[in-house]
Amino acid sequence: METVAEKFPFRSNDYYLSLIDWKDRQDPIRKIVIPDIRELNGGGCTDPSNEKDYTKLPGLQHKYDQTGLLLVTDVCGGICRFCFRKRLFMNCEREAVKDVSANIEYIREHEEITNVLMTGGDSLMLDTRRIESILKELREIPHVNIIRMGSKLLAYNPYRILNDPELVSVLSRYSTPEKRIYLMAHFNHPRELSDVSVKAAEALNNAGVIVVNQTPILNGVNSDADTLTTLFRNVSFAGISPYYVFQCRPSIGNTFFQTPVEQSYEIIQKSWKACSGLAKRARFVMSHATGKIEMVGKTAEHVFMRYHQAADPANIGKFMVFKSNPVARWFDDYRHAVSDFQPRKVWLF
């Protein structure tokens, strides 16, 4: 563990560690946060989505027209072993900034930005007064209608919400009926959704904050249909909408967490068979350098994808057909596009 942590730091807390079954070496919660020697096996890169290409100012990314992304901290309540921004915790150049005034001005000048994502790091790791300061500045920009806050603290440390009534009050103040705050939660396994987490989510809901959930498919954590079914159902039961299911990005140290893309798709499809419509609203996407690419279907010979979101607006909605590649783990592994695909006709009479 120490050898791995020297390269990829470890961070957690007593609450989250208490969720681990220490007698089980394959415990999924353990895999999420405890260093694994396989992280040193090589492969992957520090910036798999080429975020540097969309960085307009230190701490500000503008990849999609409508969305501005603020890196407000490089601290998390725990460090996920599969984090796609491991570079923030390594000996790399600092990307998050404390002074966001220039970034706020950029957002003010770009009226196409209708929503801003506060992330990092974990946005709720900021001091409550600092959170309020940023929210206040963003709410003074007329064209910013949605503020999103990326956070795994509902899983890592729900007491951050329950033990700080001022935080809940601040969020309530700036999440209005016309302009909501969305909390982008990160429950990866159903056991993370404890009674305490549900109470914290309820406090946010009562404050007018809309909570949604996103998770990657993680080998050995949630890479089976039964686990995903339970996760999708339980978050929806708690009033948390499934939002995205991500293909695990090819970040440095992440290789053993990845499942093949087509296997991920099949796991999700199987998991949905026992879910209501409300529990299966998530889209399965790859957060590629060029945009969010959704896998929408497959046959024995082909896979079907579309750009759900794209850095180049002309690509939004673009439909793509590729020859099946059962070992592909990322979009770049699909090299055989089918330009003349014609659906097979089936006569019903």
Describe the function of each predicted region.
Residues 1-63:
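Flexible, acidic/Gly-rich N-terminal and inter-domain linker regions that tether
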Residues 1-12, 305-349:
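Radical SAM enzyme core and accessory elements
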Residues 9-12, 56-84:
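N-terminal pre-triad scaffold of radical SAM enzymes
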Residues 16, 80, 243:
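Conserved, mostly hydrophobic/aromatic
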Residues 83-95:
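Iron-sulfur (Fe-S) cluster-binding segments and ferredoxin-like electron-carrier domains
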Residues 101-109, 115, 124-275:
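Conserved AdoMet/S-adenosylmethionine-binding subsite of the radical SAM
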Residues 129-137, 293-314, 321:
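Short flanking/linker segments adjacent to small metal-binding domains or redox-active Cys/His motifs
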Residues 263-305:
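A C-terminal junction/extension of Radical SAM enzymes
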